[in-house]
Amino acid sequence: MASKPEKRVASSVFITLAPPRRDVAVSEEVGQAACEARRARPWEMLPTKTPGAAVGRSPKTWTPSGKTNASLSGVTPQLSNGGCSLPPPSLNEEDLDLPPPPPPPSAYLPLPEEEPPVLPGKSLISDLEQLHLPPPPPPPPPQAPSKGSSVHPPPGHAIPSEEELPPPPEEPVTLPEREVSTDVCGFCHKPVSPRELAVEAMKRQYHAQCFTCRTCRRQLAGQRFYQKDGRPLCEPCYQDTLEKCGKCGEVVQEHVIRALGKAFHPPCFTCVTCARCISDESFALDSQNQVYCVADFYRKFAPVCSICENPIIPRDGKDAFKIECMGRNFHENCYRCEDCSVLLSVEPTDQGCYPLNDHLFCKPCHLKRSAAGCC
């Protein structure tokens, strides 16, 4: 009794294909990997014996619609990504009653069309226009980064090379103020550094240690000082250079009155007769250099006219002249002939004075008195 043939089911192998890529090198690697995988399965390359060969019909293989067995048997189909497709599995008699398997999916998957990227700002404006809302205000202009701050570009943006960047503007190198001092010390004639203590006095700059009294070398920084002949002096040394009062002997510091080659305090320069302060008025001196006011001096030392017996002094701002004759003093207006009262001249002429026995006469009266034997 013949044994019943065994049922054999050929297992089908499904290969999940990766989506195609644009990189040619990667596609070739995938095709080579698929071919190597096929070579690694020798059982698929061996011919399979169909147990139904004794029945008298050859098994039929399924072919896709629109293609014949002749076109499929002679050429091994290749995928678009460079891989090799597996041959269709062999079927037995029991498998012929099964419905044909669904057609395999297409190896080529079309790439979606690339759409231009939509900026978020334009999509936001279009949405606002549909809602009848005003568009947002434009973004502020980019501000130049401050010095010392680092700017990081957003991800996905390439940083331009150094050749593409514009050269930085050339800024003049400026030194801080007073770093290089042009002031020179008025005493040692060396530069005054801005970091050193300095004193400004008498329109010049000095080191603090150089601004001293020129007599006793006392430090004058922050102290009261005096200037004499362009030299700074402390108060004691300055007072030693001042003049002493010609009457009291004290130093004259404020207002000074100079007379007789000396200096006086205003209260010390007074008249010796009335003790009135003369100040800047006119004064007179006697033989002992004593000071008198003009009025007291004339009252004491002015000559007295022998005719009117009044002192001969200037009046109403006019100078007064005295005439001396025979040891007597006369005013100009009092110098007349005692007989005819004619004004006598001081010149030795006919209109001059012709005295006779201590009397003043003109020439005609003098001759008349002499002839008469009078006086």
From Swiss-Prot:
Pfam families reported in the protein's UniProt record: LIM
Biased composition (Polar residues): 60-83
Region called FERMT2-binding, residue ranges: 278-375
Compartments where located: Cell junction, Focal adhesion; Cytoplasm, Cytoskeleton, Stress fiber
Region (Disordered), start-end ranges: 40-176
Keyword vocabulary terms for this entry: Cell adhesion, Cell junction, Cell shape, Cytoplasm, Cytoskeleton, LIM domain, Metal-binding, Repeat, Zinc
Biased composition range(s): Pro residues: 98-107, 133-144
Sequence segments annotated as region (Filamin-binding): 1-69
Protein origin, superkingdom: Eukaryota
Gene Ontology BP terms: cell-cell adhesion; regulation of cell shape; regulation of integrin activation
Keyword tRNA processing: no
GO molecular function: filamin binding; metal ion binding
A cellular component annotation (GO) from this entry: focal adhesion
Residue intervals of the LIM zinc-binding domain: 183-244, 245-302, 303-372
PANTHER family: FILAMIN-BINDING LIM PROTEIN 1 (PTHR24207:SF1), ZYX102 PROTEIN (PTHR24207)
Function in brief: Serves as an anchoring site for cell-ECM adhesion proteins and filamin-containing actin filaments. Is implicated in cell shape modulation (spreading) and motility. May participate in the regulation of filamin-mediated cross-linking and stabilization of actin filaments. May also regulate the assembly of filamin-containing signaling complexes that control actin assembly. Promotes dissociation of FLNA from ITGB3 and ITGB7. Promotes activation of integrins and regulates integrin-mediated cell-cell adhesion.
Subunit structure: Interacts with FERMT2, FLNA, FLNB and FLNC. Interacts with NKX2-5.
Name used for this protein in its record: Filamin-binding LIM protein 1
